[in-house]
Amino acid sequence: MSYIYNLLKQFLAFLLNTTDKYVGNFGISIIIVTILIKIILLPLTLKQDKSMKEMKKLQPELEKIKQKYANDKQMLNIKTMELYREHKVNPLGGCLPILVQLPILFALFGVLRSGIIPADSSFLWMRLADPDPFYVLPVLNGAVSFLQQKLMGTSDNAQMKNMMYVFPIMMIVISYRMPSGLQLYWLTSSLIAVIQQYFIMKKGA
């Protein structure tokens, strides 16, 4: 697994450096490569969303089965699998796309943390190898994180509602000392995720 991860890192490092040679700015290279990766992974994102929607539709029937066979675990499992087969739903369908995406996104994150960003490279007001001096990127990352959770919908659970406000603050605290290049990747990736989520929800409406 580590061998595949290292290969991914080498490929992504090559992609970043090659893009930088053509565009002449490492910040723009980070944005372009992040967008490219997100586009490549879009079919998996759509597949994951479709699988999650199918599972959501089955929830009322799954609850009935759970109540009916609450004291018979074996029959509960049999009836649950029968329901999945009947509706041609794979319960792991929502997990598999994530398992494919995560190594790629972590590899890109790892490449940017490894010192690949040239020490003298800059983008807008910031030096990419240093933290954002005005803390604009950490605040934007927190705001986009909040927007992302709002798009996904609020839960009736009080703890989950609190997390919707706590998590963006945690994002700001975690990221404010990170190199600006890493924060730029994080922001670009999150913004694309928000745009994707918006259009997926609009399509399903």
UniProtKB/Swiss-Prot annotation:
GO molecular function: membrane insertase activity
Locations listed in the record: Cell inner membrane
Keyword entries, A-Z: Cell inner membrane, Cell membrane, Chaperone, Membrane, Protein transport, Transmembrane, Transmembrane helix, Transport
Keyword Lipid biosynthesis: no
Pfam families registered for this protein in UniProt: 60KD_IMP
Gene Ontology cellular component annotations, sorted alphabetically: plasma membrane
Main location class: membrane
Disulfide bonds: none
Entry membrane topology: Multi-pass membrane protein
Keyword Chaperone included in the entry's annotation: yes
Residues annotated as transmembrane: 26-46, 92-112, 181-201
NCBIfam families named in the record: yidC_oxa1_cterm
PANTHER family: CYTOCHROME C OXIDASE ASSEMBLY PROTEIN COX18, MITOCHONDRIAL (PTHR12428:SF65), OXA1 (PTHR12428)
Function: Required for the insertion and/or proper folding and/or complex formation of integral membrane proteins into the membrane. Involved in integration of membrane proteins that insert both dependently and independently of the Sec translocase complex, as well as at least some lipoproteins. Aids folding of multispanning membrane proteins.
Subunit-level organization: Interacts with the Sec translocase complex via SecD. Specifically interacts with transmembrane segments of nascent integral membrane proteins during membrane integration.
Family that this chain belongs to: Belongs to the OXA1/ALB3/YidC family. Type 1 subfamily.
Protein name, as recorded: Membrane protein insertase YidC
Name of the gene encoding the protein in the UniProt record: yidC
